[in-house]
Curated annotation (Swiss-Prot):
Source organism: Tetrahymena thermophila (strain SB210)
Pfam families named among the record's database cross-references: La, RRM_1
Every RRM domain range: 247-335
Entry protein name: La-related protein 7 homolog
Keyword RNA-binding found: yes
Assembly, per entry: Component of the telomerase holoenzyme complex, composed of the catalytic core (the catalytic subunit TERT, the telomerase RNA template component TER and TAP65/p65), which is associated with two heterotrimeric subcomplexes: (i) the replication protein A (RPA)-related subcomplex, composed of TEB1, RPA2/TEB2 and RPA3/TEB3 and (ii) the CST-like subcomplex, composed of TAP75/p75, TAP45/p45 and TAP19/p19. TEB1 and the CST-like subcomplex are tethered to the catalytic core by TAP50/p50.
Gene that specifies this protein: TAP65
Purpose: RNA-binding protein required for assembly of the holoenzyme telomerase ribonucleoprotein (RNP) complex. Telomerase is an essential ribonucleoprotein enzyme that copies new telomeric repeats onto chromosome ends by repetitively synthesizing the short telomere-repeat sequence 5'-TTGGGG-3' using an RNA template component TER.
Amino acid sequence: MDEYLENTNLEELEQECFMEDYQHEDVVEQENHQVDANDIYENQQMNDESQLNQDVKISQQKEQAVEMIEEQQQNNQDKFKQFQDCMAHITELNFKRNYQNLTEQSSSNNVVAEELDIKESLKLQMEYYFCDTNLTHDSYLRGIISKSPKNCVDIKVFLKFNKIQQILKQIQDKQIVSTYGIENQSQKKNHKNYKNQNATFSKKDLIHLIRDSLKESKILKVKMDSLKVKRRFPFNLEQALKNSKQRTLYIDFLPPKCSKQTLVSIFGNFRIININLPLQKNSQLCQGFAFIEFFSEEEANQALITKNSSIPKELILLTEKKIGQGSIRIITYKKWQEEKQSFKELSKNQNEQKNKNMNQSRKASDEFVSIDVEIKQNCLIKIINIPQGTLKAEVVLAVRHLGYEFYCDYIDENSNQINSNKISLSTQQQNTAQCSNIQIENNLIQQDQHPQLNDLLKEGQAMIRFQNSDEQRLAIQKLLNHNNNKLQIEIRGQICDVISTIPEDEEKNYWNYIKFKKNEFRKFFFMKKQQKKQNITQNYNK
């Protein structure tokens, strides 16, 4: 019994020891797990902090890169703005150098009054060749630049240009004078070294001279080793044209004797960089309009405000007969393009309608069918008190500036007929004093052919019919601008009154006359066509 108890106690003791060992191992294992978890947490925290620091560092680097890019872009924009200002200044200097004898400038503004240094002249001319103003119109040089590698042009190419040759000739002349002591023109002509200029300067020397003159250029970069030149900023034709149009004004109602000298005198208070004044081929007279490009868009707008609808004294002196002339009209280049496009669309619509009517006429039956005329309200003006004996060409000349296409009905007292003149004017012809270039369709109607025709137009009267009411309002505004807010026009040196509001009965009577006239002409051509058919049939039967 004692032995049994002893064995039992021993087993219990062993079991207790086993449980204690197990619990101890479990505690140790839990402690180890806790240590591992703490280590993992600490490592994760360290990794998170490292990643955060790295992200902050990357973000700072990105911000610095963005700031550097923005600063670089701003610097490039500033440099490009300086580049454009420098180009405009060079263009202005070149214009003044070419036209300094056209106007009297003050000593402060006459930049080129003093003789420029030869190298400075060479630099100015080379810079002008690469300016936007010149490259916009110089397709030859644009082609050379585009075909050259990296837009670098050999300097030797410019030795063939006329302006460069003139400057180089001045250099050679000075060199000969200083070397051989030539003092007058007769000695120059007889001197062998003057006749043979290559004895003084070689082609290589001239190229090096051009290269050296461009070292300080703000517009051009020169490669000293390869003797090539290029712009500091590439040329963009589309942007250059856009900038040029923004600072260009269109001026019309100029007299035939107007010249570039006159325009320089009128706009002498503003900086001009280019004048385009088209001339007639035979007479070399002004076609009546011009394009002037100013130094900046702001100066162009200021010139528009200051000079528009004015009567410059320079033009009054040129105008012997003020027929439709006086104040000039100035509009922006964009407005001129809109007017030009509007006129093209109007002409296109009229041609389409004309072709449509012709096709309908061809398909018509053998019986004549009269047509109706659309009555257009408020598109007439009437001129009265026209001097006796005035010819139709003189009336046309007086009203030619009122619109692009309109009709002029006028009684020719010599033939006792109504002369209905369709006047079609291009933009150039609108201001041309010569009537020979104006397309006129003469439609003659006997006065006794239409009832109430004598009440429509009496002696010394003319009716002007425009395409629509908008063109009529524009014509009235032109008359007011030209005649100090008076509805008048000058014909044969006599002031004639203009009536802008036609009574309703008279207007209705006029449109009845237009309908009658059109049908009379259609009937005339219809009968002529029928007669032609009969002749063909008779000849065929024979």
